[in-house]
Amino acid sequence: WEKTFAVCWYGVYYGCRAFMSALVASDGAHLVNVSSVNGFWATIGEGVPHTAYSAAKFAVKGFSEALITDLKVHAPHVKVSVVMPGHIGTSIGFNTPKVLRGDNAGAAAQVQSMRKRLLGAGFPAADVSDEQLLKLAAERAAAFRDSAPTTAAQAAGIILDGVRAQRWRILVGADAEYLDKLVRAAPEHAYESSFIDDMRAAGHFTALMPGKDKR
């Protein structure tokens, strides 16, 4: 929990602290912080806890929004944007275990963590072999990258266009835009099963949150 929160929140915070003096000293600057759709909707589906990541992304969004006024007062030439991507096709599923645990030494820890999550979600994972779990992890990582509606290159283009237009709020992907509208239209229902069903019916986040019949 602490490591996820530290990377996703303090990584942004300390990055801003490290570069702020240089930004203020420049003639013009633009600070771009990456939050997530989980910065305004704190789940990835029913029965899947997502607390540490969502808390960090909410923090990034709130911090970035607060900086808008702060910088208008103290450094009006420095602009701020907060980026909220939806499902973007990256290799994060492959790279995260390598960075956090190492290529080989961390395989056992990855299997143990994955087995625990699957059992907690009600999947019969006790008798599944380590090799099968590692294969499943690789398949999921590939599916996350390859089934995304927005590529990493497209996401970069959307972000740069938003910065050029000096938009402080940049939603990345049609799925992010749809989710934002849905949450705003019915905030009290944002964590109900029907809310997720509405997203699936509209064709958004189907790879990340499959229907109950596909779990």
Model-derived segments and their meaning:
Residues 36:
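Residue(s) in the substrate-gating loop at a strand-loop-helix junction
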Residues 73-170, 174:
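SDR active-site lid
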Residues 1-2:
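Substrate-binding pocket helix/loop in short-chain dehydrogenase/reductase
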Residues 53, 57:
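Active-site YXXXK catalytic motif of short-chain dehydrogenase/reductase
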